[in-house]
């Protein structure tokens, strides 16, 4: 029989199979910004893991727009997906109220108030505190932060880690926090504001990859040098270490592991297992971008 199937080039009709099993063999994935490097790497790894278990994915990019997010979730439901993996814009968990109660769901990079989903997170607050301590340990006291938008879970957690470390060191100054909205342009504008403020800043901590790129563009454009003029810690290495001198100290998230774990948590729910949360550890990689100051 197998030989006959191979000779005929038979391909199983998954739609017909789905009608029998009441499964579409498809997982819906909803991302706020697919152009974001963070999202792209996670989705790629997630797809590989789900494919190994016979599932395809249907990806929606909601462009950080809550209305598009709602429309996209309704679209995924209409396609009868077997589960959803979402990077929610909001942390209130209300977005999941749009879905059937029994639909397996996983939230990435956000801790929501919903008890009906599993979560995959990193130790945002702890790793940001460690990065900030690296700067204070090198004698820095005027440390600027380029943060994401207020109210976004990851941005808030990373800011809190920075604040806690500086409060312990006795040098916290809220005026040194600049919002960069997790985009290259946002990082660029925030860094230019810091450089032009002349407020004694000697070090900068940037809390995502796109803003890190934007901040470095601004530093180069204004003729400043790292670490001679400003010590610098960025977020996520990706290709930075290959193209930038000196090597930038960075907080590196386990992006591929995040994707794998998100897929695993969803597969567990599809198998009838209980929801659970996973917190992964990011790493702080030293570079040559932090100097000692007296």
Region spans (language model):
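Redox-cofactor binding/interface segments in oxidoreductases and associated redox assembly factors
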Residues: 29, 86, 206
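Active-site-adjacent beta->alpha loops and helix N-cap segments on the catalytic face
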Residues: 91-100
